[in-house]
Amino acid sequence: QALGISPRELEVLQLISQGLSNNEIAETLFVSESTIKTHISNLFVKLDVKRRTQAVIRAKEWCIIA
């Protein structure tokens, strides 16, 4: 994507939009919670947001997720 969002970051973003916690996302993707926090941090920079809800709203506005 033009924003440089990786496939894994997109997967994390979709799970955030479904209301999953960092721990739940980590368990779903079989990675550590620390890894998820890193992906979320990267997403915040790429989407220019500060909160999870803002990330989901921005991603929907930009048609990154449905």
How would you name each of these model-derived features?
Residues 1-15:
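Regulatory hinge/linker segments at domain boundaries
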Residues 6-8, 30, 58:
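Exposed, low-complexity/repetitive linear segments and helix-based recognition motifs
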Residues 19-54, 61:
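Recognition helix of helix-turn-helix DNA-binding domains
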Residues 65-66:
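…primarily DNA-binding HTH/wHTH and HhH modules…
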